[in-house]
């Protein structure tokens, strides 16, 4: 039964973490030629330490509404204290009447200047997962 459901892959949708002055912000970037409709994003941070203990943040949910083609939407501010955690963003949206979702994970200690790239559409530098 599940094999009968088409498994479309998410393409041309990115999550970017950008430093803006003293602040850091997380953005959803729509590189597609079509809008993303009813966008929902779930975000959380987590890590399991060598001794087995876990550190977790609260899970936050964001309703971004529609994101036009070739544009972006701010998801949330992020603080440097959580860069030592894996930061997960689970994006769900409709595109061409199809429900799509993708999980983006910034691994611990990867949000740093040496990993910066130019973020398309946003025209700023930051860390991006496509």
Regions found by a protein language model. Give the residues of each.
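Intrinsically disordered, low-complexity Pro/Gly/Ser/Thr-rich segments with frequent PxxP/GP/PP motifs
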Residues: 49-86, 96-97
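Short acidic, flexible loop segments centered on an aromatic residue
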Residues: 33-50
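Residues that act as N-cap/strand-start positions at coil-to-secondary-structure junctions
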Residues: 9, 23, 58-61
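Low-complexity, acidic Ser/Thr/Pro/Gly-rich terminal tails and inter-domain linkers that flank the onset
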Residues: 1-21, 31, 103, 109-110, ...
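Exposed beta-strand and adjacent loop surfaces of beta-rich binding modules
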Residues: 23, 36-38, 88
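Short edge beta-strand/loop segments characteristic of extracellular beta-sandwich folds
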Residues: 25-32, 78
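Terminal connector regions
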Residues: 76-130
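Surface loops and adjacent helix of pleckstrin homology
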Residues: 29, 41, 105
């Amino acid at each position: 039964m599940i094999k009968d459901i088409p498994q479309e892959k998410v393409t041309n949708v990115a999550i970017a973490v950008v430093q803006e002055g003293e602040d850091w912000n997380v953005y959803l970037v729509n590189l597609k030629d079509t809008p993303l409709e009813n966008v929902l994003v779930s975000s959380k941070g987590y890590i399991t330490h060598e001794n087995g203990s876990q550190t977790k943040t609260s899970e936050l949910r964001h309703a971004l509404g529609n994101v036009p083609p070739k544009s972006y939407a701010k998801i949330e501010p992020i603080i440097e204290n959580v860069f030592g955690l894996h930061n997960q963003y689970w994006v769900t949206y409709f595109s061409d009447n199809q429900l799509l979702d993708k999980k983006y994970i910034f691994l611990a200690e990867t949000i740093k200047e040496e990993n910066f790239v130019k973020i398309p559409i946003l025209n700023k530098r930051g860390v991006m997962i496509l």
